[in-house]
Amino acid sequence: MIERKHVSARMSKIVKHNGVAYLCGQVGNAGDSVADQTSECLSRVDALLEDAGSSREKMLQAVIWLADMSDFAEMNAVWDAWVPEGYAPARACGEAKLARPELKVEIIVTAACD
């Protein structure tokens, strides 16, 4: 069975199937620093993980898009502090033109769920 949560015409914020939660991409507040945007993204990920019956410790994969790879270290400092030790997911990070020019980071997470 597929369960969709927070559904709009364009997307669902959470899709659950066979014990896996797929979260839509999360962005931070436009105009903030990369660190601030990353922190906001991860706060939103936390909320969606909880809503999906999951947690940081159950993350399977993360895909991170940066508008500029020169922000990699700044984003990683926030990410590294957020991920529980010993529970790092499979992860990829690349550079992409994001939906709005003021956005600097977008994070997409997949996690095991109840």
Regions found by a protein language model. Give the residues of each.
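N-terminal presequence-like segments and the immediate start of the first folded domain
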Residues: M1-L60, L66-D114
